[in-house]
Regions:
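Anionic N-terminal interaction surfaces
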Residues: 1-28
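Acidic, Ser/Thr- and proline-rich intrinsically disordered linker/docking segments
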Residues: 50-125
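A near-ubiquitous, low-amplitude feature marking generic local secondary-structure context
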Residues: 9-12, 16, 32-35, 74, ...
Length: 125
């Protein structure tokens, strides 16, 4: 799975990066985000989300060319790539129904072929 070298849209510094790999899952239920990574479950309140960005690469079509990064506060970010089975449901059917996602930025990111960061949500924006 493609990893991003620098995550410009998420604050730099000592952060915990939780990566949702192919065998893992990411869901939203009852205002809580559930990240199942390996045998570990991470749970975050929806209220803790500071920012959500879409990251694009210039590596398509052989690698995932878009990823979602969710800043859940406490120096923790969750990452999921666009080809993951949970990506579309999480973004459009779950988180997109409860937060004010900037869908114009989602469209721009979807058509981008460069390395770029698109902020699609910021708390109190």
């Amino acid at each position: 799975m493609q990893e991003f070298e620098v995550v410009e849209g998420i604050e730099k510094g000592p952060m915990t990066h939780l990566r949702i790999e192919i065998e893992d899952s990411l869901t939203l239920k009852d205002n809580y985000i559930y990240a199942h990574i390996g045998k570990q479950e991470y749970v975050y309140s929806l209220e803790k989300i500071e920012k959500i960005v879409l990251l694009t690469t210039d590596l398509g079509p052989f690698y995932d060319d878009m990823g979602l990064a969710i800043d859940v506060g406490n120096d923790t970010a969750i990452f999921i790539m666009s080809e993951h089975k949970c990506f579309n449901d999480f973004l459009f059917e779950q988180i997109g129904k409860v937060l004010s996602i900037d869908y114009q930025k989602v469209i721009e990111a979807s058509s981008c072929i460069e390395r770029k960061v698109f902020e699609i949500y910021r708390k109190n924006s």
